[in-house]
Amino acid sequence: MNKIFTDQGFKDFLYWQYQDKKTFKKILDLLKDIDRNGYKCKGKPEPLKGELSGWWSVRIDEKNRLVFRIENEIIEILKCDTH
């Protein structure tokens, strides 16, 4: 699947790339798993409610979450930081 980022999602992605290689690798691993398994990926995927209805959240670590959705074989990343 192709991946696209919102502006905030891309800023978060770049932040982790330069600030914390371990967290960045975890994000890359999650994206690969989402690509293979969709919403049945690792990281305890949960559908979000309210204004983020339609988006899903998976755990990067205890504090941070990757928020994404899949539409038409495209993974859209909203953010990768604190939930």
What does each model-identified segment do?
Residues 2-4, 11-25, 56-65, 69-83:
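Enriched for short, Lys/Arg-rich terminal
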Residues 9-10, 44:
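A short alpha-helix capping/helix-coil boundary motif
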Residues 16, 31-34:
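Alpha-helix boundary/capping residues
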Residues 24-32:
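PIN-domain endoribonuclease scaffold, especially VapC-family toxins
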Residues 33-58:
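A short, surface-exposed loop/turn module that caps and links secondary-structure elements
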